[in-house]
Amino acid sequence: MPASTSIPETPSKLPDALLVNSDPASKVDNVSVKIEQESPLALEGSPLPTVSDVLPETNNAHEEVSSSSWSLSSSDSIMSYDSLSDDVSVLSFLDCPLTTFETAPSIASFSNSAADVSSHSRSSSSWSAKLSRFTKHASKPSLSSNSSDSSFSKSGSESNALSSRGSFELEPHGIHRHVSRAKRLLSKFYSKFHHKKEDSSFDPLAPLVFAPNTSRVLRVTNEANASAISLEKATSLSSQEQPGSEIKKELSLYDHEFDQILDLAIKAKKDGNLENAIEFLEYIMPEVASQQNFVPYELAELYKQRGTSQDLKSILPLYMLAASLGHDRSSFLVGEAFFYGTYGARENKLRALQYYHLANDKGNADAMLALCKLYLRGLPGHIFPSSRRAFEYAHRAAMLGHAPACYVLGKFYETGVGCVKDLAKSEAGFRAGLINDSPITDADALQIASTLVLLQ
């Protein structure tokens, strides 16, 4: 019998140098740290970081690959762009998914347990230091091993303090204490527009932080019934009195009917009666500004049309008041005022960048286009140039149907800066931007287009 050849057995255990760890958990200083695959910390191009998170980008090739979860997904679906039909919306040819704006993820979804955090060394917790940038109230691990009880009691008191604070104080991008700023601005205008017939015991700042008083709601309802009965009589008598008496009569009858006075202001603005519209809005502004944040914005726009020296001084405070109450257009205009130093504001690029981000979070397309311009060129001392992030801001604004942003997005695809060059999508963007054959007059859009031509 021939001697059997021995077949070498496959080793049951590979050498340590050839082992590949497929588990998403990695070892850092003998401590297992769970890394979420969908966590923003695992994505180098996470969308909309804070100003301090923007880092220099040294590899353009890597910048093309890294993208946020809402960025362009042209590799997923391939469409034919040979012919562009007018029957289909040109925005559909951009192959950009319509998604909601992403918010900052919850800290609890990618935070470690208390035992893991306490066992980390300072050299191995760089990811937790980066994580703390998402919120200024992030809990810090204690360096002392004997202070666990005190740290737990401190975190409990901090959570109670957070629950009692207003929602405006937790706004991102460094703009905090919006309620206190709104109360301070509103108190100035209330002292200016205070009326003798107004109840002196009523606090106009209460609606900013408290629910409407039940007794006051009942009193307003009773006065509404009385004013509705005498409305027809007041209208007939106003034509026989002096020209300025009509407004005073209506204000006395509609003493607390703010919605109806607001309707009168809107009607006066449409009719071109600027003085009446301003007087109506000045009267109701301290009362309704907290519930209807467009009232300070509309009053500032009327002041801008009238154009007196006193009016021009009041425009920026009114814009800041409306921005503090969540008005997106006012946030963008305050950013413009700080960026260019207009309306009496001192030029402050960082403050302008913060207000641009605040307006962007509210969904303002003009602010997105302004951020696109800043990230494309860079802002010395604050942000580094990033063509990819500039493309994402233009993409988001174009998905809102903003015509200048559609034109800018077409220019991105034409030049191939920050994205893959695609002439078909470029043509679709240009057609979406030229609505009703109107030329692009937006200053930011024209500056971005000229910059893209230089960068290609």
Swiss-Prot record:
SMART domains: SEL1. Keywords: Phosphoprotein, Repeat. GO terms for cellular component: cytosol. The modification Phosphoserine is found at residues 227, 230. The keyword Repeat applies. Residues 1-20, 38-74, 139-158 are annotated as: Disordered. Residues 140-158 have a biased composition (Low complexity). It comes from the Eukaryota. Sel1-like repeats lie at residues 293-327, 328-364, 365-402, 403-438. InterPro entries: Chitin_Synth_Reg (IPR051726), Sel1-like (IPR006597), TPR-like_helical_dom_sf (IPR011990). GO terms for molecular function: enzyme activator activity. GO terms for biological process: chitin biosynthetic process; fungal-type cell wall organization. Signal peptide: none annotated. PANTHER family: CHITIN SYNTHASE REGULATOR SKT5-RELATED, PROTEIN SKT5-RELATED. Involved in chitin biosynthesis. This is Chitin synthase regulatory factor 1. The gene is chr1.
